[in-house]
């Protein structure tokens, strides 16, 4: 590996680190460290003595999962490649690398000392450093064709490309914009009907992987409105970060989901659409008008407003310089 490749790789690891920190994740230990392989025959790591510790960990993070009601640890592998260097075989190679690392990490005593036990989750962040050439449909084909062997103790790997990573950056930038004008902004986790009461409604400062890959991300906040020197009132504002195609059918489906956890119980609901959605403005405006007319007719004080997330072409430069 050339010095330039090493520099760009380290820079992307730093950017990945800051993206996840800005999403509220907690880092464990250092970046770019090795752990021993405990399954050398299966992982074929004993064939060369060039590297004593064959499994490298770019980043190790953890967060509390409201749906599972427990802390989980995630091994993050960050890859930085030109588009020509991203193929079905390279993505398969990256995936296998993460799987083998997790198999050995789950029983590693040093990681247990960091509070990371029974690690069974990974995040593979593959960034194409030629964003103008990146083909998301082709990348999705590569992911669909991955060969994943059945394991007695399952491992879950989330694979993110430019498409997902830039969406996360858009959320981060919008939340930074919102927080100075709002109080108590937190991401919202509805109760999970399928968990037999294990999961109750929750509000957290962080996003979990399930939400990060979801077409809808929910949040709640308050706005303090000062009426005069001595009097103020509080306005409840709910948020939906909307990444699906905003047709009337999709919007109606999304709202049918929110009814189950009373997300319309607020003074204002802001839907943050991803991009300007010019070609679907008719659908959006029609849906919002119908909803607001119904709320007014029913005597509800809720109003729906529209906002738009910027679609970024690259990861913001300041993400490579420490937490932004």
What name fits each language-model region?
Residues 1-56, 61-324:
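Intrinsically disordered, low-complexity Ser/Thr/Pro/Gly-rich regulatory segments
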